[in-house]
Swiss-Prot record:
InterPro entries: DUF4711. Residues 153-178, 246-276 are annotated as: Disordered. GO terms for cellular component: membrane. This is Uncharacterized protein C17orf78 homolog. Residues 157-178, 252-261 have a biased composition (Polar residues). The keyword Transmembrane applies. Keywords: Membrane, Transmembrane, Transmembrane helix.
Amino acid sequence: MDTILVFSLMIASYDSNKNDLRKSSCQVEQWPSFFSEDVRSNKDLVVRVPLEIHTDTKGTPFIQNQPIATLRCLGSGRRVTVHLVYSERRPKVKYIMKNLPVITDLPRNSTASPRCHLRATSQFQNGSLLTAFLPGISQCTVYSAKDRSASSEMVPITTSSTTPRSKGDEATSTGAFPNPLTQGIDMSLKRRQKWSLVVKALIAVTLLLGGAAIIVFVIFEVPCPSQCLRVRQLCQCQWLWRRKRKEEDQKPGTTESQLDSQPEKVKHNVPNSSDSKKTTDIAIIYQTYF
């Protein structure tokens, strides 16, 4: 039973860690910006993946390691962490993106803010949407990865208006493309994580209690408490009472059969005793006369 519980705990931990956000994170060094540390807040970012699928000589599709979006990041001046959540193309279908490096370019103009380039190293379909968390970012503007000229930097082609994440508001608003179903999927992910934690806690408690009982009462042979002894005595008393009752139910038949057989034995034995007396008397008389 303990082996089954251990394997179930391993399976539950694997299922919960499969969608863990910490496994799909990457970091980038953020350069000093125009904003102070007081305006830091967690942001949601949704970008479109404009990658084109190429084919090699064998005809197998692959995606080149090229930028998919350019971020104009104005943050706290510290390290920025990008947590990948999912990539969605159709409702109720999501694609987990685990490899998304972020590269920082130092602008030629010292007054300009640094840019973060998102690069995809996995294969994704065109038109999919990427949802990411950007902690420590005050303001982000998304640019197209194909247009990297000065004019495109001044006038964004694709913009994303981000709002601070709070406990009550987890939605993301975008200006150039439809909003994916982020709230429903995020809630389902959190619900699965919560239930996985509950299941793991129950399995751990069961394993601890079972292991402690086996170690104490079986290995070290510690006697049971008084309550356990009382229960055992009650069980033994009930068992003895039932056994006696069965024996009493079987006794009347045996006694009657014994009583029926005894008179016959007496009847058979009585003639034998009289015959023996007669023979002795005759023998004595014979001896006296001669």
